Amino acid sequence: NDHIRPWTGFTELDKQAHKMFYAYVLAKCEGESVNMIKLIEGGIFEFFHRIVLTDIKPPIYHKLVKEKGFQIDNWVLSELEEHMDGIGGGFFERMKKYYLDKDYASLEKQILKAAHYHASNWEFKIIYPMNPQTFGIEQVKTEMAQGLAACDTFHGFRYFAGSKYLQEFLSLIGKLRYQQRWAKAVRMPETFVMGHMLVVAILSYFMSLELDNPCRKRLENNFFSGLFHDLPEVLTRDIVSPVKNSVKGLDSIISEIEDEQMREVIYPLLP
């Protein structure tokens, strides 16, 4: 937050949402060895962890985690515990295991780390040209490159690095970080489409945990359906319901246009 950036800025919510899009694609590149439930929950755990420490600059945050990680994790868990009572399915117990058992979800942690660096690098590519004279910018560039290189610990990372189309797909999705929801209405705070999609995904997952013995595939599908549900808006923008309902049949026409745009622009970027 101490560099010049676009006037809309960057929010932690949108960053965490973008990270989960990267995590999904990296997991698919890795293949069947990924436990998608652990990946989903790990992403939510790390989001909540970052919320508690959100005012700390990233370099300081990473240094603290590296040197005092166990103490910080325990403190964060104690801060979050009272707020987790309403989430069923043993969610908070798994969160404690995620942070206190270093062998738990090891592959999924690697994927989420890589996703974090990719989302951060997407931001940095925007910030860098705006800050050529800012003190320390070249050091940040070097640290970003080193951080990404250090994530080369699983096959899916290398597969993704060699796929121009998948990289373009996730760069395109990044545009949702700048699309304001209900732009003609006053919303405090302002919310953007990408962050909204993550909120829907997390709430869908939490509601799914309340079901009687939900199958793993249902949990996975409910989360990622929520995460991707507004993807066509990267091509059509956020057309609000009052506009869609103002003319009879307009909503159907918009849906047809969205389908057409998905076929022409999005699907060719996917394997």
Please place each PLM-identified region on the residue numbering.
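Alpha-helical, largely C-terminal catalytic domains
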Residues: 1-271
